[in-house]
């Protein structure tokens, strides 16, 4: 019998930052979930989350579906051994950790018309904005972040102003915690999940599917 497939978001679903746990939620960090660029622990699981992760890894096929890029997911300390959907769905990694070539070709074709627009948007906005790249030098989406979570009104005000300057046709805007992202409509977790599930069903047949997440972008899968 095929194992169930569990599609799960990562940040604020399976783990969260120490700051959020201690300062906002009064939770005790139990186990490292992810490290920062200097390889110091940054995000943690509660004991309950740790137990859930271990159970899912043993009883199901756990597939992360995350906004994290391919570099960021490499810093997650959960031993995934199946597929992974990263970068808001722009990249699908095989169990060997390599981009799926069929999905890569599809996404490169979909993103080609957005390259000039994304570059122009980033160039005309202040230093809060940056482009996220995958597949070498392919711009995938633009994101603005604020390090101070008590000043998110400033971030949202700038985001509102940008929406009046740049037409949002062909994009959708994802606001989550301390960041606002402008994503091309082909870059979407739900589209990547649907493609991967169709591929796996063609290979394996029927299997149960469960989705876990914390935001509207996760509702799509």
Spans of features found by a protein language model:
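A structural signal for short, well-ordered beta-strand segments and their strand-loop junctions
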Residues: 7, 63-66, 84-86, 132-134, ...
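Short loop/turn segments at strand-loop or loop-helix junctions that form parts
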Residues: 8-20, 87-89, 95-97, 136-137, ...
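The start of beta-strands in P-loop NTPase/AAA+ ATPase cores
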Residues: 4-6, 81-82, 209
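Active-site phosphate-binding/coordination module
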Residues: 43-127
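Short amphipathic alpha-helices and their capping/turn segments at secondary-structure boundaries
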Residues: 1-5, 73-76, 161
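Conserved acidic, metal-coordinating active-site core of Asp-based
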Residues: 124-221
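Active-site neighborhood of HAD-like aspartate-dependent phosphohydrolases
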Residues: 1-6, 10-64
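Short glycine-/acidic-enriched loop or helix-start segments at secondary-structure transitions
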Residues: 17-18, 24, 73-76, 95-96, ...
């Amino acid at each position: 019998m095929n194992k169930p497939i569990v599609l799960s978001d990562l940040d604020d679903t399976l783990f969260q930052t120490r700051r959020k746990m201690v300062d906002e939620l009064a939770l005790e960090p139990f186990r490292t979930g992810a490290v920062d660029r200097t390889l110091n622990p940054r995000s943690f699981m509660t004991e309950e989350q740790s137990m859930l992760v271990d159970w899912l890894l043993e009883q199901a096929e756990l597939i992360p579906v995350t906004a994290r890029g391919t570099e960021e997911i490499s810093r997650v300390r959960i031993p995934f051994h199946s597929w992974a959907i990263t970068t808001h769905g722009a990249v699908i990694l095989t169990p060997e950790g390599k981009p799926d070539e069929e999905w890569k070709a599809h996404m490169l074709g979909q993103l080609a018309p957005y390259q000039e627009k994304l570059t122009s948007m980033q160039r005309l906005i202040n230093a809060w904005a940056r482009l996220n790249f995958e597949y070498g030098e392919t711009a995938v989406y633009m994101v603005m972040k604020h390090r101070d979570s008590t000043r998110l009104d400033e971030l949202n005000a700038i985001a509102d102003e940008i929406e009046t300057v740049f037409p949002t046709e062909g994009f959708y805007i994802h606001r989550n915690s301390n960041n606002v992202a402008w994503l091309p409509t082909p870059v979407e977790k739900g589209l990547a999940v649907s493609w991967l599930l169709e591929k796996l069903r063609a290979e394996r047949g029927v299997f149960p599917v469960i989705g876990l997440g914390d935001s509207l972008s996760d509702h799509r899968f």
